[in-house]
From Swiss-Prot:
Protein's gene: argS
Protein family: Belongs to the class-I aminoacyl-tRNA synthetase family.
Keyword Ribonucleoprotein among UniProt keywords: no
Catalysed reactions, as listed in the record: tRNA(Arg) + L-arginine + ATP = L-arginyl-tRNA(Arg) + AMP + diphosphate
GO biological process: arginyl-tRNA aminoacylation
Alphabetized Pfam families for the sequence: Arg_tRNA_synt_N, DALR_1, tRNA-synt_1d
Name of this protein: Arginine--tRNA ligase
Location (main, coarse): cytoplasm
Length: 565
């Protein structure tokens, strides 16, 4: 039951020159729920109807068929619609209970491919907390797109190419110890990388060594290729362990090295179109007409830059997947770079360049401290996830001593807490991470939402009722309507999150639904003898529906929803 559609249809009956789509985009939700469930502003009608908006609203409100509504009234220039709580509420509940997994879904994508590139850690370095944002924002966006009928293709574009990788080889050649690497590959390789960057301040030749090793790799040197394969293998093995903890799974792990094999084609096109210009020994693309700085393609030493691989990658992906959109979930410090990428593709003659979408996000700090792999103050993501699970286990043991699957629930709550904290914040905002605050069962946290649902599931188990097909769902009252009408907003919330590429809309919705349910749980008598059986079953149906919607919302965020906590 789409209340917004009911309003649009009622309005079209008195505005025959307007299409349903034109009306739909004008319909609003009043900030004050006392003003109705939906509102329609009449300002845009003033010019054609040659009347004041207040008069138009009053006239139309009188003409509208109120059969599906409790009331329709004009308030100033707005027409406010109050849905029939009994009939509409029953229809909404029926829709949720009949197909909970698909509730809120809209087939807007029609199966079109959307490439989503996210996480993209550098090989031979551990996944730090800084990778959490890209990984979870990207995964949530992919899930939201799938909910809306698109086919997301998840790509982990590994950072396995570049001069920084040459530095890793140079460091290994100077200080490498195979036994240490076999024992703890990632942290050992990281220590080499940190050391060469630190010592390069006094030994500039170390930077040159790194560039030389990368040049060897580009030209197929066997030793360079051997080291590359080894570093990549041990890194990917470790990454997949973290991805399994997060329940993140990719369709492709092809990285920059794969793209490096295809660089000749974009460079050829750039040369043929006369787009490459010599500048201080390097070759650039002039993007002045886009109000963008020049884009370096070939360095003065003859090595390629990131852009050659990204151009090749974009061309390959369009040819291979025929994408509708190609999304890159990368920090906001890369905004200008992605503008340059799109502009360069346009100059090369690709009309799909505007289908390249950069989803930017703000930096994460830990207890107010910035992180830097180069300086060595990186916070290991796997360690944080394990610590969060331990904290969750401690809280669960205090709340529910006899919980049978406590370890599994602790994983779901602990990891979910970290993920939810990231996604509840608008992605472009910088965020600070404090683990003890994140895992609390109170406040705007993942465990708070999970616990609200678990309370509902406990109530349902105690009732012994699992089938609501014969429930009289018209028996809901004002308290239930507060929950039901809010659940009716779920589809709009998902669509908003999809259109803005902003998972925080889902997280905020889940928090608000949990808050409303906790209030309902505290003030409404359900499993008591003096409550009418039909009313009791209708109330339990509402609890079941809330449980379904919270679980669905958490799933879009890649957060588990345990039935018991």
């Amino acid at each position: 039951m789409n209340g917004k559609q009911l309003v649009a249809e009622a309005l079209q009956a008195v505005l025959p020159d307007w299409s349903l789509d034109d009306i739909d985009v004008k319909i609003e939700r009043p900030k004050d729920e006392k003003l109705g469930d939906y509102a329609f502003p009449t300002f845009t009608l003033a010019k054609t109807m040659r009347k004041a908006p207040n008069l138009i609203a009053a006239e139309l409100a009188e003409k509208i068929d109120q059969g599906s509504f409790e009331k329709v009234e004009a308030v100033g220039p707005y027409i406010n619609f109050f849905l029939d709580k009994s009939q509409t509420g029953a229809a909404i509940l029926q829709e949720i209970l009949a197909d909970p997994e698909n509730y809120g879904a809209r087939d807007l994508g029609h199966g079109r491919n959307v490439l989503t590139e996210y996480s993209s850690p550098n090989i031979a370095k551990p996944m730090g907390m800084g990778h959490l944002r890209s990984t979870m924002i990207g995964e949530a966006i992919a899930r939201i797109l799938a909910k809306e009928g698109f086919k997301p293709i998840r790509i982990d574009y590994l950072g396995d190419w570049g001069t920084q990788f040459g530095k890793m080889m140079a460091a290994y050649k100077m200080w490498g110890n195979d036994a240490d690497i076999e024992k703890d590959p990632i942290n050992t390789l990281l220590s080499y990388y940190v050391r060469i960057n630190r010592e390069a301040e006094e030994h500039p030749e170390y930077d040159e060594d790194g560039r030389e090793w990368f040049s060897k790799l580009e030209h197929g040197d066997e030793e360079a290729k051997r080291l590359w394969s080894w570093f990549r293998e041990v890194s990917l093995e470790r990454f997949k362990k973290v991805y399994d903890m997060l329940d993140v799974h990719f369709d492709s792990f092809t990285g920059e090295a794969f793209s490096a094999q295809m660089m000749d084609k974009p460079i050829q096109i750039l040369r043929e179109k006369g787009l490459l210009v010599k500048s201080q020994g390097a070759e650039i693309v002039d993007l002045e007409k886009y109000n963008l700085p020049p884009l370096m393609v070939i360095k003065s030493n003859g090595t390629s830059t990131y852009i050659t691989r990204d151009l090749a990658t974009a061309m390959y992906r369009k040819k291979t997947y025929g994408f509708y959109k190609s999304i890159y979930v990368v920090g906001q410090e890369q905004e200008v770079y992605f503008q340059q990428l799109r502009a360069c593709l346009k100059e090369m003659g690709f009309d799909w360049a505007d289908d390249i979408v950069h989803i930017s996000f703000g930096l994460m700090s830990i207890n107010g401290q910035k992180m830097s792999t180069r300086k060595g103050n990186v916070v290991n993501l796997e360690d944080v996830l394990n610590e969060s699970v331990d904290l969750a286990r401690k809280q669960i043991s205090e709340k529910n001593v006899g919980l049978k699957n406590a370890d599994e629930v602790a994983k779901q709550v602990g990891i979910g807490a970290v993920v939810f904290h990231d996604l509840k914040n608008y992605r472009r905002n910088p965020i600070d991470f404090n683990l003890e605050e994140v895992v609390k069962f109170e406040g705007e946290t993942g465990p708070y939402v999970q616990y609200a649902r678990a309370r509902g599931e406990s109530l349902l188990r105690k009732s012994g009722i699992t089938d609501f097909s014969d429930a009289d769902l018209t028996k809901i009252g004002a308290e239930e309507w507060d929950l039901v009408s809010f659940m009716a907003r779920y589809a709009d919330t998902i669509q908003k999150a999809m259109e803005t590429y902003d998972p925080s809309a889902i997280a905020k919705y889940a928090l608000e639904l949990a808050k409303r349910f906790n209030k309902y749980y505290a003030h409404t008598r359900i499993l008591v003898d003096d409550v009418d059986e039909d009313v009791k079953k209708a109330r339990l149906a509402v609890v079941q529906a809330v449980s379904h919607v919270i679980k669905s919302a958490l799933d879009l965020l890649d957060v588990k929803a345990p039935d018991e906590m």
